[in-house]
Curated annotation (Swiss-Prot):
The keyword Lyase applies. Its main location: cytoplasm. It comes from the Bacteria. Coiled coil: none annotated. The gene is sufS. Keywords: Cytoplasm, Lyase, Pyridoxal phosphate, Transferase. This is Cysteine desulfurase. The lineage of its organism: Bacteria, Pseudomonadati, Pseudomonadota, Gammaproteobacteria, Enterobacterales. Pathway: Cofactor biosynthesis; iron-sulfur cluster biosynthesis.
């Protein structure tokens, strides 16, 4: 496979550092990905040479910054194949995007006696906002269970839907198991029953091309920092017809048309009515640079390279006798495992001494831990800059821990 891995690795300056006297092996990109120099440079350039407050400024710097920000909105729309840039809302991240939908769409369109569906594999960010909404409104939450292999059974969805069901919130790729859900089929079944569908794409957009119109979902959410972009910036996509019906969630500057102490406030059109206050303009610029970066490499070549690396990693890890792997064979991005009866924290601490960075704990997915009846797991995640040598270092580290701890 002719993927330019050496050039790619050279683009990420942090990968050259050492940790505990060892060359860094960074296997925690599912938590937050490293940043290419192009993203770092873009933010630096904006702060150094072009910074100004956006919106309504008549001076050149403000006009330029506003134009650049809106250009990124169009770029994001093109990246996920939205019908219009006006379907793209800038938020702080996936968590805020889901909370926005729950508090704007949910509180406006749902009522006591309605039901919504989530799955057993969701990140807490796609559970807790719906629980809070359900508690306040008297809405029922129904849970779509998993199979033994950590997958959703498409035919099980129909039994969860009745005439009270209004919304389905589902992840495209599990942040723990790497399960790639057949979102297009799921959305089609849900839409046939009249449901609104929110898709959590936080673990998908960096691993595969996304076309929200082809998927047919009503809302799609993701974060910049997992897409090799800055922290503190994310995206909510919403179908225009829905966004125009939704009230603002937060109030403040930039999201209004008029404000009167006697006549009240009228709000801007979507998407701007959902962007109260000063935006993370530098983060938006960096997100644009990150999208440029992965687009130049090509998401299909990235997907093919990562899938080849994933197959290699699973084959090598399966040779460790005391290691338990969780999730399906075909997956994207992440590998969850435990080593014998050793606590994930201990395994992660030992690996850190060898310069290997993984994530340990419940991964903001406590219901999934309960499903597997474990308190925690180790998670190694693969990105476009990882190599077989990284996998070999991980395997060697685990084998060393196995010998040390028994």
């Amino acid at each position: 496979m002719n993927f330019p891995i050496e050039r790619v690795r050279a683009d990420f300056p942090l990968l050259s550092r050492q940790v505990n006297g060892q060359p860094l092996v960074y296997l925690d990109s599912a938590a937050s990905a490293q940043k290419p120099q192009a993203v770092i440079d873009k933010e630096l350039h904006f702060y150094r040479d072009g910074y100004a407050a956006v919106h309504r400024g008549i001076h050149s710097l403000s006009a330029e910054a506003t134009q650049q920000m809106e250009a990124v909105r169009t770029q994001v729309a093109d990246f996920i194949h939205a019908a219009s840039a006006e379907e793209i809302i800038f938020v702080r991240g996936t968590t805020e995007a889901i909370n926005l939908v729950a508090n704007s769409y949910g509180r406006h369109f749902l009522a006591a006696g309605d039901s919504i569906i989530i799955t057993e594999m969701e990140h807490h960010a796609n559970i807790v906002p719906w629980q809070m909404l359900a508690q306040d409104l008297g809405v029922e939450i129904r849970v779509w269970p998993l199979t033994a292999t950590g997958e959703l059974k498409i035919t099980a969805l129909a039994a969860l839907i009745d005439d009270t069901t209004r919304l389905l919130a589902v992840t495209q790729v599990s942040n723990v198991l790497g399960t790639v859900n057949p979102i297009k089929d799921i959305v089609a079944q849900a839409k046939a029953a009249g449901l609104v569908v929110l898709v959590d794409g936080a673990q998908a957009v960096m691993h595969q091309p996304v076309d929200v119109q082809a998927l047919g979902c009503d809302f799609y959410v993701f974060s910049g920092h997992k897409l090799y972009g800055p922290s503190g910036i994310g995206i909510l996509y919403g179908k225009s017809a829905l966004l125009q019906q939704m009230p603002p969630w937060e109030g403040g500057g930039a999201m209004i048309k008029t404000v009167s102490l006697t006549q009240g406030t009228t709000f801007a059109d979507a998407p701007w009515r959902f962007e109260a206050g000063s935006p993370n303009t530098a983060g938006i610029m960096g997100l644009g640079a990150a999208i440029d970066y992965v687009t130049e490499l090509g998401l299909l070549p990235i997907q093919q390279y990562e899938q080849s690396l994933m197959h290699y990693a699973l084959a090598q890890l399966s040779q460790i006798k005391s290691l338990t792997l969780y999730g399906p064979t075909e997956r994207a991005g992440v590998i969850a495992f435990n080593l014998g009866q050793h606590h994930a924290y201990d395994v992660g601490s030992f690996l850190d001494q060898y310069g290997i960075a993984i994530r340990t704990g419940h991964h903001c997915a406590m219901p999934l831990m309960a499903f597997y009846q474990v308190p925690s797991m180790c998670r190694a995640s693969l990105a476009l800059y990882n190599t077989r040598e990284d996998v070999d270092r991980l395997v060697a580290g685990l084998q060393r821990i196995e010998k040390l701890l028994g």
